[in-house]
Amino acid sequence: VMAVEARIQMPNVTGTAAQGYWPAFWMLGAPFRGNYTNWPSLGEMDIMENVNGVNTVWATLHCGTSPGGPCNETTGLGGSTTCPDATCQSAFHVYRIEWDRSGASEQLRWSVDGVVYHIVNQGDVDATTWANATGHGFFIILNVAIGGSWPARPSGLTKSGIPMLVDYVSVYKSI
């Protein structure tokens, strides 16, 4: 089992002041570097995404072809949950993906503060799609975008300059 996790406090802004905010912690397949045209087949694992300051975290595997394809692109194979105990914006939370290759079938598991809320199994897509999306290295990305294809468009009420705070990023591998 390999796990990638980070302890993050999303930008502490909500309501109309958060319109357009899009913090994310994600991994993109290494074959993207130098090619830039092979998304989503090379795999993208969104460990944490949030939009517009709502108390929801999204997790998604992007793979296959776009639009449509075995991973329902451009949406991907995703799930969501609220942050436990305190909002995503008002406190630090641990966002994690576990990549379990220990069984006969591989599995990706997403959790927040130790609570699993989304699972994608190898059998959810065909073997070629899974191999193309997971059979290589990944690079980790942490970013905050303002605007884009998913969040609302920023308005005059959007408060700029609110940071995403990152306590740590770790990668673990079972021996």
Regions found by a protein language model. Name each.
Residues V1-I175:
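GH16 jelly-roll
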